[in-house]
Amino acid sequence: MNFNYLIKNNILNLKPYQSARRLKHSGKIWLNANEYPIAPYYKGQYKNINRYPECQPPELINNYAAYSGVQSDHILVSRGADESIELLMKVFCRPNKDFIIFCPPTYGMYKTNAEILEIYYRMIPTKKNWQLDLSSIQSQLNNVKLIYICNPNNPTGNIIYLHSLKKLLKIIQNKALLVCDEAYIDFCRHASLIQLLTEYPNLIILRTLSKAFALAGLRCGFTLANPKIINLLTKVITPYPIPTPVIDIATQALTPQNIQYTQTRIKKIHNNRNMLIKALKQCSCVQQIFPSYTNYILVKFYPQYQVFKTLLNQGIVLRDQSYQPGLMHCLRITIGSYNECQLVISTLKKLKHSTF
């Protein structure tokens, strides 16, 4: 049976977001999804697994409130930050009428969710230094409801200037909402907009436990916003969005002791990142290394070395960013364990220009 006549045209023509797992590369060293290389251990207690969980578990919310420094009524828990990206569009954007803005090169799920929900989008590229083009944004605010800014930006790893974000918040006041995706902010907490949350009611912050907390498989994220916005999001979120095991582990992860463990992980990532950057500078295949405040590095390689293909053939999986505007021949390298970083370096140093 041909189902095509039943399918919405936008879904029929949709190109799904190519997540690291969906690409289905085979390998032994996974440095393509910005995951922590070692799984943390938490004890599971599932006595009430026969019961539906609370829609918004209070203990988990209170723990994250203590960690983030905001009031509990400013927090929504979701299945990763990805779910909040979608929920915000459902609440604020009318299909085939309203617009969102995002600024490539950046995270791909803003575009994908807009296409799924039939919401128009304007892609306003960043400047050459990957900072916001505020004048272009200001001139294209007609019918815009949401502006998604990833900070630190994925995949470039840079921080958006605080004064630019403050200026943007003032530009769009009473016009649109700024959604600041802070998935990687735990690696550079000084750059967070959290201190602006009470000052600017049009600011929304997205967070996750997938990166610094090493819980990507858990799928647990948070939206920080004005309580009125949080209440709107609870209207459209599914009745039981967070599974009981996720609530249990996430609540444990946000206790003071386990937050200390997370801080230790972050220090290890910083050390490995510095070591990897220093070693990459000695590799003849490397054309440019971009500064990073995150758990990954964006690197531009000379094309004749065929780095992505060569490393993939040896079981080392990186993330090719060449499809993004301005990132031709660029690969994103997750900061793995010390041994994984050493393996990447030793493999790159063996590559010879004359080999290809």
Curated annotation (Swiss-Prot):
Disulfide bonds: none
InterPro entries documented for this protein: Aminotrans_II_pyridoxalP_BS, Aminotransferase_I/II_large, HisP_aminotrans, PyrdxlP-dep_Trfase, PyrdxlP-dep_Trfase_major, PyrdxlP-dep_Trfase_small
One GO MF term attached to the UniProt entry: histidinol-phosphate transaminase activity
Modified residues (N6-(pyridoxal phosphate)lysine): 211
GO annotation terms (biological process): L-histidine biosynthetic process
Source domain of life: Bacteria
Annotated transmembrane regions: none
Signal sequence, start to end: none
Keywords: Amino-acid biosynthesis, Aminotransferase, Histidine biosynthesis, Pyridoxal phosphate, Transferase
Record-listed E.C. numbers: 2.6.1.9
Pathway(s): Amino-acid biosynthesis; L-histidine biosynthesis; L-histidine from 5-phospho-alpha-D-ribose 1-diphosphate: step 7/9
UniProt subunit comment: Homodimer.
Record-stated family: Belongs to the class-II pyridoxal-phosphate-dependent aminotransferase family. Histidinol-phosphate aminotransferase subfamily.
Name of protein: Histidinol-phosphate aminotransferase
Origin species: Blochmanniella floridana
